[in-house]
Regions:
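Intrinsically disordered, low-complexity Ser/Thr/Pro/Gly-rich regulatory segments
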Residues: 1-230
Length: 230
């Protein structure tokens, strides 16, 4: 946006989809209703500096227990956990946390950024739209204010699409998002707040109240589809 003299700084390592972060994010996002407790438990353990967690699967349906166990095993095989052990008789999964900062960051919210990034990239590619996409973009305004945007796309010949990702409390950030949208000079439909905490009705209500677009994991793809088709 040269008219507004806004400068964007990219870190290309953050959009490298050759690792397993994007696949893991997609699994967590698509099965979020089932995996939310696992994510919360891991986040809590990191915050409290606990080295491990136990997941008791005995009170779940066989299908759900199997899905969670399989996910944990897959995440372990891709080094998201340092150790994985399933105690079959007790139906307990024992997980030792990985100390690598990139993995901790992933569980603390990075997975949602990856999920939104991949969703946006997929929508653009499916429609053959040339666009630059990036995660964690530092944006410098003319007065040298620095802001970081979680996910941004610059579709050719169109205004930017910004997605801010919140896997926890987001209400205190609404005012910041409103100011940011105005400074970027983009339509409310193109400034998206993606949160795991809202159902469709709540997201629609907040979208009506504020000049922003609120979505959840289920409605993100649908909203992006309407933007990319436009």
């Amino acid at each position: 946006s040269s008219a507004r003299k806004i400068e964007a700084r990219f870190d290309y390592a953050l959009v490298d989809t050759s690792g397993f972060f994007d696949d893991a994010a997609r699994m967590l996002g698509e099965g979020h209703a089932l995996y939310a407790e696992l994510i919360d438990r891991v986040r809590f353990a990191y915050r409290k500096s606990h080295g491990w967690i136990n997941l008791e699967l005995g009170n779940l349906s066989q299908k759900d227990a199997q899905a969670i166990n399989t996910l944990c095993r897959q995440l372990y095989s891709h080094t998201f956990f340092a150790r994985y052990h399933y105690q079959k008789p007790e139906k307990i999964v024992r997980l030792t946390l990985q100390t690598a900062p990139a993995v901790r960051q992933f569980f603390e919210g990075g997975w949602l950024e990856w999920y939104a990034f991949i969703e946006l990239l997929t929508q653009l590619r499916q429609r053959g739209r040339p666009a630059s996409c990036a995660r964690s973009v530092k944006v410098v305004f003319p007065n040298e204010d620095l802001h970081e945007l979680d996910v941004i796309a610059l579709p050719e010949g169109q205004a930017p699409i910004c997605i801010e990702c919140k896997s926890g409390e987001f209400r205190r950030d609404i005012d910041k998002y409103l100011r940011l949208r105005k400074r970027l000079g983009i339509d409310r439909s193109r400034f998206i707040v993606c949160t795991t905490d809202l159902n469709d009705e709540q997201a629609a209500g907040l979208t009506t109240m504020y000049e922003l677009t609120f979505v959840n994991l289920g409605s993100l793809g649908r909203h992006l589809q309407t933007l990319v088709q436009g």
